[in-house]
Every structure is written in C-alpha cells, then in structure tokens.
C-alpha cells in the first residue's frame, strides 16, 4: 500500500578521510551546471567568460552565507544563539532558500554597479540557472530522508521515512488509528514532498524560465516570472510539507515558507507591472 523508503547512507564515500555527502554532491553538481550553462549564455547578455565566473562564484558565496543566516534568523534563532558553535556546522543541515535569495540579491546589486548593468538585466541571466540547483537540492533532501511531507494515511503513494519515527510517536500518542499504523509500519506514511518540490521547483520552473529566456523580452520579465512562479509553487507545496516543529504554523494556517514566499509574488507582480507600463 505504501512505499518503503530505502535507507541511504548520507555519506557516499570518503576521500582522504573527508566524507562526501549526498547533499554536498548536489550543491557541487548545481554549481558545475550553472557554470557551464552560464558560459554558454554569456554572449547573449554581453558578458565575458571571466565576468560570468566571478558573478557565479560570488552568487554561490552569497547563497551559502545568506542561506545559513536566513535559516538561523527565520527558523531557529533561539537554538543557534544558545549554541553558537553549531552555526558553522552546515553539514548538519539548515539552509533557507529565502535567506540565500537575499544573499544573491546583495551580490547582484554589487555586480550591477561593477558591470554598469541594471540589476534586473543580471538577474535575468541568473534565474534560469536556479531551478537545476533547487531540483538537485530536493533530490538530496529525499535521499537523506529529510524534510518529508505531512502525514497522509489515505494516500496510497505515501512514503514511510524511517527518520520520522521520533516525531511520529509523539503525533500518534493520542490517536488510535495512527498508533495502529506505527505498530504495523514503524512510522507514519507521509507525502514525499521533496519529489513534489523537485518536479515543480526543479523541472517545471527550469523549462518555463529557459523557454522565456530564449525569447526577446524586456529585461526583468524573466526575473518577474521566477519570483511569481516560485512563490506560488512554494506556497502550494507547503501544504504537503511537514512544518518545522520548532516554529509550527502562524495563526495555525501559514508556514514560515509560505509567509516568506508572499513578498516574492508581490515583488514579481510589481516588476511585471513596471515592465508593462514602460512598454506602453
């Protein structure tokens, strides 16, 4: 009835006693793809190969720093302020897309002045490269058996994630139906939300953005599509994703991911309106 999640080791192999993890591999592949794809599109955006390399290296630094700081501030400030030594332990998990986005925006502001280009012109170059990284990251989450979805006993394609047992025992404590499921399967069946995110944030967003990036559009248009679509996809997908237990839901309705995605949609719409007004 349900799909049993195959238990993968988070470590693929080791090189000179340095563990190579799935999540790290996904980030590495995302960077290699972005570097390759960015260089093939450089001429269209009047960028040199060196400018592309410097831009992408800087964006990845902004992504990591912003992603980590964003996670600390948005999702778990109390823990990290009480355990400062854990801030640099990125391998233990804890990155925020929205924090990473802010980090990249800061980098783009710097490069827009350095290259004497409008920030939206540079962001139009960057955003088609993003979905591959998003998709790779979600696959990494799935392989690690983390960031699973909400409990879904009535969905026949629900997945049994071994890592969810601790939370599942607490959830099922006062529910006979859920208790019986744990007795039978060990854990509760959940939506494989990482796969949903891989499809929408990775595949669909990749094809849409790369389709429009090949068209002759006013600069800022591709960026507005990215902001609107990602924001809408994230708000929708959070319905299936298990809320972060340390913060739960705001007003018993909205997750942190949904709240942070709302300004993205608003900003994307404002950019699109501005483009429309200028075209007229």
From Swiss-Prot:
Pfam families: LGT
Its EC number(s): 2.5.1.145
Top EC category: transferase
Membrane-protein topology: Multi-pass membrane protein
Subcellular location: Cell membrane
Transmembrane regions: 15-35, 60-80, 90-110, 217-237, 257-277
InterPro entries hit by this protein: Lgt
GO MF terms held by the record: phosphatidylglycerol-prolipoprotein diacylglyceryl transferase activity
UniProt GO BP: lipoprotein biosynthetic process
UniProt keyword terms in alphabetical order: Cell membrane, Membrane, Transferase, Transmembrane, Transmembrane helix
Function, as annotated: Catalyzes the transfer of the diacylglyceryl group from phosphatidylglycerol to the sulfhydryl group of the N-terminal cysteine of a prolipoprotein, the first step in the formation of mature lipoproteins.
HAMAP family recorded: Lgt (MF_01147)
Name of the protein: Phosphatidylglycerol--prolipoprotein diacylglyceryl transferase
Source organism (scientific name): Buchnera aphidicola subsp. Baizongia pistaciae (strain Bp)
């Amino acid at each position: 009835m349900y799909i049993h999640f195959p238990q993968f080791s988070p470590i693929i192999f080791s090189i000179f006693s340095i563990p190579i993890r799935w999540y790290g591999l996904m980030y590495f592949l995302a960077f290699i793809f972005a570097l390759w794809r960015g260089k093939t599109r450089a001429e269209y955006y009047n960028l040199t190969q060196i400018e592309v390399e410097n831009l992408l290296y800087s964006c990845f630094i902004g992504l990591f720093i912003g992603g980590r700081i964003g996670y600390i501030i948005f999702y778990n400030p109390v823990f990290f302020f009480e355990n400062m030594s854990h801030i640099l332990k990125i391998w233990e998990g804890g990155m925020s897309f929205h924090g990473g986005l802010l980090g990249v925006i800061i980098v783009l502001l710097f490069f827009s002045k350095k290259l004497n280009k409008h920030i939206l012109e540079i962001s139009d170059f960057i955003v088609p490269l993003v979905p591959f990284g998003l998709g790779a990251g979600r696959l990494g989450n799935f392989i690690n058996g983390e960031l699973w979805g909400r409990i879904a006993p009535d969905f026949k394609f629900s997945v049994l994630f071994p890592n969810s047992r601790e939370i599942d025992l607490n959830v099922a404590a006062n529910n006979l139906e859920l208790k019986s499921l744990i007795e039978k399967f060990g854990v509760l069946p959940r939506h494989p939300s990482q796969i949903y995110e891989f499809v929408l944030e990775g595949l669909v967003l990749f094809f849409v953005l790369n389709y429009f990036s090949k068209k002759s559009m006013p600069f800022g248009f591709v960026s507005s599509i990215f902001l609107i679509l990602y924001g809408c996809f994230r708000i929708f997908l959070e319905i299936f994703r298990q809320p972060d237990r340390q913060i739960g839901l705001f007003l018993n309705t909205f997750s942190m991911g949904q709240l942070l995605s709302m300004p993205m949609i608003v900003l994307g719409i404002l950019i699109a309106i501005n483009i429309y007004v200028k075209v007229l």
